[in-house]
């Protein structure tokens, strides 16, 4: 499906969802800054627009803008109204997956199988808008699109693609990705999950435990990576209800509370041979999935950072201390300038990386560089915004503290800040530093 085709689909689907209009509150005003600010008057001289400092808008295609704007409306009108209580009560709304499937934004870069087939930049713009609301919602979308649909599309058989991708694209099926284990986070090569082949009945028996798995408590499908008897790493498609398979929820999170996180416990789960992903047999499989997901994260975290910047700016303009707005304070202006600079540079780097991906010129090191940079900078921006809000900054009604808490997790998962530094260090020096003496 062409970009223009998916744009039309997004718009036509939107009317069917009948988005309600919610009264504007101060806490959501910053998210709508772009709608409420007066555009500079046209003149013969260029005028600096702080909302788009290096004119990113002109580098996007008409279809990319339309896709983004349509999804932005959905996120602000349907999701922003739910997130406060969802985060406060640690509730994941399954209906959101159906709604996103209706909009066509799940697995959006995949061509065929009910997917939209949009550009990598369009996908990045979608994650940016979603994480502007909440990192937990974006995490769900990233897992579904990059860690479940991508491996089935890239490493799966045609039968597997036909069987699973249409349902995943519609949101009828929700998936999760099992790689991290209790004793193996940054070192997936040490995984203890085992798959034993049973030639007599053409199946595999999986045993092991995965943890910190987004979507697992509510998942219908489980993409699980296990070490086989030949020492190869293979991917398996497990289905909810298989004997010996359970996915208990992890309770008490202070981050990503609007998404469901849990474990995958496999007690001699029998999986038919037809559920093995046939086109990969090494860690290149899960790493390829993670690189795809990390790309979406590089855009997404900047959406959260933008929300924090806009909220802090509006608060500094409205808040009067010592008879003047906080925004008159030089230290506050410096913080806002630093935030704007980092967001702008990050967005343009994301755009370049997206164009390179669509030309098959992107490398894992490029993704690591931006995942590391943008996550770290977004977390710093959220912390600075919370500081500008003073005591109000710790109230969830202003949303900034929620973004800060979420970004603590995002800066850690799918490769920590330091692990990505080692990936880059290896590329720079030619020497791996993940292990000592090897």
Curated annotation (Swiss-Prot):
Substrate binds at residues 138-139, 186, 287-294, 415. The modification N6-succinyllysine is found at residue 51. It comes from Mus musculus. The keyword Acetylation applies. It is an enzyme of class 1 (oxidoreductase). Belongs to the acyl-CoA dehydrogenase family. Its EC number is 1.3.8.6. Its main location: mitochondrion. The lineage of its organism: Eukaryota, Metazoa, Chordata, Craniata, Vertebrata. This is Glutaryl-CoA dehydrogenase, mitochondrial. Pfam families: Acyl-CoA_dh_1 (PF00441), Acyl-CoA_dh_M (PF02770), Acyl-CoA_dh_N (PF02771). SUPFAM superfamilies: Acyl-CoA dehydrogenase C-terminal domain-like, Acyl-CoA dehydrogenase NM domain-like. FAD binds at residues 177-186, 212-214, 319, 330, 387-391, 416-418, 434. Pathway: Amino-acid metabolism; lysine degradation; Amino-acid metabolism; tryptophan metabolism. Keywords: Acetylation, FAD, Flavoprotein, Mitochondrion, Oxidoreductase, Transit peptide. The modification N6-acetyllysine is found at residues 51, 65, 240. Catalyzes the oxidative decarboxylation of glutaryl-CoA to crotonyl-CoA and CO(2) in the degradative pathway of L-lysine, L-hydroxylysine, and L-tryptophan metabolism. It uses electron transfer flavoprotein as its electron acceptor.
């Amino acid at each position: 499906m062409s970009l223009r085709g998916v744009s039309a689909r997004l718009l036509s689907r939107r009317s069917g969802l009948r988005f309600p209009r919610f009264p504007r509150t101060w806490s959501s005003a910053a998210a709508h800054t772009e709608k409420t600010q007066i555009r500079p008057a046209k003149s013969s001289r260029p005028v600096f627009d702080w909302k788009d400092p290096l004119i990113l808008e002109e580098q996007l295609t008409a279809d990319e803008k339309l896709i983004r704007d349509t999804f932005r409306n959905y996120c602000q009108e349907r999701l922003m109204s739910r997130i406060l209580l969802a985060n406060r009560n640690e509730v994941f709304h399954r209906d959101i997956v159906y709604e996103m499937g209706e909009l066509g934004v799940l697995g959006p870069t995949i061509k065929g199988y009910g997917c939209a087939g949009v550009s990598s930049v369009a996908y990045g713009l979608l994650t940016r808008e979603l994480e502007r609301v909440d990192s937990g919602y974006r995490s769900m979308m990233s897992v579904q699109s990059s860690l479940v649909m991508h491996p089935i599309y890239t490493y799966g058989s045609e039968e597997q693609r036909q069987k699973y991708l249409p349902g995943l694209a519609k949101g009828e099926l929700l998936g999760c990705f099992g790689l991290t284990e209790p004793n193996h986070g940054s070192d997936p090569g040490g995984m203890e999950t085992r798959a034993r082949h049973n030639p007599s009945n053409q199946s595999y028996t999986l045993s092991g435990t995965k943890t910190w798995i987004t979507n697992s408590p509510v998942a219908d499908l489980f993409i699980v990576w296990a070490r086989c008897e030949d020492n190869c790493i293979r991917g398996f498609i497990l289905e909810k209800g298989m004997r010996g398979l359970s996915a208990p929820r992890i309770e008490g999170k202070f981050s990503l509370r609007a998404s469901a996180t849990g474990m995958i416990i496999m007690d001699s789960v029998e999986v038919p041979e037809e559920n093995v992903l046939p086109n990969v047999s090494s860690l290149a499989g899960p790493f390829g999935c993670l690189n795809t997901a990390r790309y979406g994260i590089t855009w997404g975290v900047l959406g959260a950072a933008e929300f924090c910047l806009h909220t802090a700016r509006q608060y500094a303009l409205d808040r009067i201390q010592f008879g003047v707005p906080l925004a008159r304070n030089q230290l506050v202006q410096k913080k806002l300038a630093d935030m704007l600079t980092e967001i702008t540079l990050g967005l343009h780097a994301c755009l370049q990386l997206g164009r390179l991906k669509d030309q098959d010129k992107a490398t894992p090191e490029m993704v690591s560089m931006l995942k590391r940079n943008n996550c770290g900078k977004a977390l710093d921006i959220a912390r600075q915004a919370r500081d500008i809000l003073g005591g109000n900054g710790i109230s969830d009604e202003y949303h900034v503290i929620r973004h800060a808490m979420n970004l603590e997790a995002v800066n850690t998962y799918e490769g920590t800040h330091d692990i990505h530094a080692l990936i880059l260090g290896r590329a720079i020096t030619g020497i791996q530093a993940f292990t000592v003496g090897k």
